[in-house]
Design a protein with these regions (language model features):
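Cys/His-rich Zn2+-binding cysteine-cluster or related metal-binding knuckle/ribbon modules and their
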Residues: 2-13, 23-51
Length: 51
């Protein structure tokens, strides 16, 4: 499985997210500019550590 398909599968784990929506999320994430993607990952990590 390539990285993109792994990302799709990870989004499918979200409640209420089916295969088409997961693919849309994955396309959105990979199309982000580097700065926004980096901030998104940093924010996710911080939220996980503090919640």
């Amino acid at each position: 499985m390539d990285s993109f398909e792994k990302l799709v599968q990870m989004f499918r784990e979200f409640p209420g997210i089916g295969p088409r929506q997961a693919r849309r999320f994955a396309f959105f994430v990979v199309s982000l500019n580097y700065s926004f993607a980096h901030d998104l990952l940093k924010t996710l990590n911080n939220a996980k550590e503090t919640v």
